[in-house]
Design a protein with these regions (language model features):
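A conserved ligand/cofactor-binding region detector
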Residues: 1-800
């Protein structure tokens, strides 16, 4: 339904009066935000009901997407935009002398995710809604999300991200649809008259209460639902409380509700590991119960479940959904084991996000057995049958069977549960999918090659272009029309204008304005001053050794030393922009943050260098900050060691906004370079086969350090340090083990950075490269990814 300005104005004024008892002229920005969000949510809710009615009427297959995190960011701007209400809302507010951007700023980022995994899941809800694929996401309603990051004297400090007070307005609770989840105790199996019975004893219950958010599709009637489970105690222990045992009464409630407090609690200790397993089973079990209940309400049988339901496991965190469905089919619905497993096999598919076998998730068998006793029994039987099936496929090869088995070395291997059960196993880039087949799951590829697929990641490109970069959007409309708004492949039409001087000049003007806007925002928000005429070189992603932010830092240190020794050298000013959180228990990542921040402070305080070089560390980097940065970016640092990054999606957002990729041929960088042309990116570093060969021979970082004067000087400089501080933890790691081969790629990275400077000085060439990237970014749309999943994995079709 479309709303006229008068209709929408009445909606907003009525809502302000009913909810806040204020007129629009007297309302605060927060009151306007909340009421505007309520209106938007209600419109999406109504549309979702209509959409779901069509889904059921047409008997469509429904897709359920299980993921530990959904990095939603802010909802108001994109929801209004996708609903076609952004302009009318802006006009209504303008009449009241209110800027809509002020209202957008009232909304906190939803604290439901951490990095690329969660942002991908959020983009796919948008893609499913836009494509008309009936989709529901499932996760946990984290009270505090990941954490708020503060940088104090170079050190990351974590504080609670209390996002719900401002974000609750998007969520509606449905306690009438709650599920009971059981942990601990014993599961007693008995047989009576040929029937199998399971009795639970001494278990602890937690109630999973569903809370729903909605994601509207663009130019579509589709609306995706995100169902988030909140943990509650089954009831308050009044008898303990009345007896004066207050701590006992409160602790039982607190223990249950701990499950939905925080995303990824520190698991460097046993208690943290148990809590993570409880989180995974809690949301997986609640989701499976919800899916099966909905299906039974519609069809009255589970016999046709595989025809009407597709469940995608995004990474291994929701793997326990598989044995949980087996449990329900066996224990509650009396299916034979073979029939139950056949249903699970047809329903479940698994997306892998790992390139290293040693990084695949495993659970200590004792923790698993004690926490999930019935699921442990089912997993043991799955392991027995898995071994029997593998023995037929690989007779006599016990080593291979043991490696592929579900249980081994006193561990439950969740990835092997997925590989054995799921009808489809997909990687998230062409290179990654080949690595899966060649190494990570090579034996399973030999066992069931037909199950292995590729679906390259995609992004909700309208959020990152139409909403975040209106200047570029307007230029594209003027140059190629507005077809790209609904069909990202239409961006390809820009390719014939990449050498058009008028278009180049217009694109450069847009980029300069975006850089100035970001510089102004940064100064207002943090007090930091950056030069909008410097090169904006950006690396924003999770802080991790494999992402190699320390490689970037080594080059900056090298440039600093070069400028100190050559003050009159030609050097295009550069602003290096970092944004990253380190996992709370990841010491080396925190040391890398400290090194980058201290290096930035050193440069800032050196008048001989600070006009040419600058480091900005964006504290508490999040989706809404990313939406400001991407349009201003010029260089996209994607510098992981070849063969370690599954795909990435930040690289796609940078590309879409015209940044040049400076990167290795890793993950989706390969497809970015293939699409835009390798000559339009700046590629460096070893290829995956070279990395594997070097590992095979035995990698010794000193062999690369000792022959490189710059490398030796930089490491010595960081070890010596300044102002009483040094960075021996990082440099010692690089000299002695260097697990991600930073020093092996350092020299070529320096060459790539030099090439970047030369290319940037040639404005015509740089603008050509930038426009080439924009014009070839359409293939990385989430719309395309979702249709690939629907066709190749889910067997789902759009609602007409």
């Amino acid at each position: 339904m479309k709303y006229t300005k008068r209709e929408f104005e009445k909606l907003l004024k009525d809502k302000l009066m009913s909810e806040c008892n204020v007129t629009i002229d007297a309302a605060s920005a927060d009151q306007i935000y909340r009421c505007l969000a309520m209106i938007t949510r209600q419109i999406m809710s109504d549309r979702q009901k209509q959409f779901q009615s069509k889904v059921l009427g047409e008997g469509k297959k429904q897709v359920y997407y299980l993921c530990m995190e959904f990095l939603m960011g802010r909802s108001l701007r994109t929801s209004l935009f996708n609903l076609g209400l952004n302009e009318v809302a802006e006009s209504v507010l303008a009449d009241a002398d209110v800027k809509i951007d002020t209202i957008y700023e009232q909304e906190p980022d939803a604290g439901l995710g951490n990095g690329g995994l969660g942002r991908l899941a959020a983009c796919y809800l948008d893609g499913m809604a836009t494509d008309g694929i009936p989709g529901t996401g499932y996760s946990i309603l984290y009270e505090y999300g990941i954490f708020k990051q503060k940088i104090v004297d170079g050190w990351q400090q974590e504080t609670a991200d209390n996002w719900l007070p401002g974000g609750q307005v998007w969520i509606k609770s449905h306690p009438d649809q709650a599920q009971e989840i059981r942990f601990d105790g014993q599961a007693i199996e008995t047989w009576e008259g040929g029937f199998h019975h399971v009795k639970y004893e001494n278990y602890n219950s937690v109630i999973a209460v569903p809370n729903d958010m909605y994601v509207a599709g663009y130019g579509s009637n589709g609306v995706s639902k995100l169902r988030l489970w909140q943990a509650k105690a089954p009831s308050f222990d009044m008898s303990s409380f009345n007896a004066g045992n207050y701590n006992t009464a409160i602790s039982q409630s607190a223990s249950a509700e701990l499950i939905s407090k925080i995303l990824y609690p520190n698991d460097n200790h046993t208690e943290g590991k148990i809590l993570r397993l409880r989180q995974q089973y809690f949301f997986s079990a609640a989701s499976i119960a919800d899916i099966l209940q909905n299906h039974l309400n519609q069809y009255g049988t589970l016999d046709n479940l595989a025809d009407k339901v597709a469940i995608q496991l995004n990474d291994t965190h929701p793997t326990v959904a598989i044995p949980e469905m087996m449990r329900i089919l066996l224990d509650d619905c009396s299916y034979e084991r073979d029939a139950a497993f056949d249903i699970c096999r047809k329903v479940f598919a698994y997306t892998n996000h790992t390139v290293m076998s040693e990084a695949l998730e495993k659970w200590n068998a004792d923790i698993f057995r004690n926490t999930l006793p019935r699921i442990w029994q089912i997993v043991c039987e799955m392991d027995r049958r898995c071994r029997a099936d593998l023995a037929k496929a690989f007779p006599g090869d016990q080593g291979k069977i043991d490696y592929m088995a579900i249980i081994g070395d006193n561990q439950v291997r969740t990835a092997n549960i997925c590989a054995y059960t799921c009808h489809a196993i997909n990687g998230v880039s062409k290179l990654h999918s080949e690595i899966i087949k060649d190494s990570v799951f090579h034996d399973y590829f030999l066992y069931k090659p037909q199950a292995f697929k590729n679906v390259t990641n995609g992004i909700a490109y309208r959020r990152w272009l139409l909403c975040s970069n209106p200047g570029l959007t307007h230029l594209l409309e003027e140059t190629i029309g507005d077809g790209f708004k609904t069909d990202a492949s239409e961006l390809k039409k820009l390719e014939k204008f990449v050498d058009d001087k008028t278009v180049q000049a217009a694109a450069a003007k847009v980029k300069r304005e975006n850089k100035a806007n970001f510089a102004n925002y940064l100064q207002k928000a943090t007090g930091q001053v950056i030069d909008p005429d410097s090169i904006f070189d950006c690396q924003v992603k999770r802080m991790h050794e494999y992402k190699r932010q320390h490689l970037n830092a080594l080059n900056i240190a090298a440039e600093y030393l070069y400028l100190k020794n050559n003050p009159n050298a030609e050097f295009t000013p550069k602003t290096y922009i970092f944004g990253a959180k380190a996992a709370p228990g990841y010491y080396m990542a925190k040391q890398m943050i400290r090194m980058i921040c201290k290096l930035g402070k050193l440069i800032d305080e050196d008048p001989a260098v600070r006009g040419k070089l600058r480091i900005v560390y964006l504290e508490d980097y999040c989706v809404s900050l990313s939406e400001r940065l991407m349009p201003a970016s010029e260089v996209s640092e994607q510098i992981s060691l070849a063969g370690t990054e599954a795909s990435g999606t930040g690289n796609m957002k940078f590309m879409l906004n015209g940044a040049i990729t400076l990167g290795t041929l890793d993950g989706a960088n390969v497809e970015i370079a293939d699409a835009a042309g390798h000559e339009n990116e700046i590629i460096f570093g070893m290829l995956t086969p070279e990395v594997n060969a070097l590992k095979g021979m035995g990698y010794h970082p000193n062999a690369f350090i000792n022959g490189d004067n710059t490398a030796m000087a930089v490491l010595d400089f960081l070890e010596k340090g300044w102002n009483g501080e040094n960075f021996n933890e990082v440099t010692s790691n690089l000299r002695n083990s260097d697990p991600y081969m930073v020093m092996a790629d350092f020299k070529d990275y320096r060459r790539a950075q030099h090439d970047l400077q030369e290319l940037y000085r040639d404005k015509q060439k740089w603008n050509h490269m930038s426009l080439k990237n924009i014009s070839n970014a359409g293939i990385f749309s989430a719309d395309r990814s979702i249709m690939d999943y629907a066709r190749d994995i889910w067997g789902a079709t759009p609602v007409k």
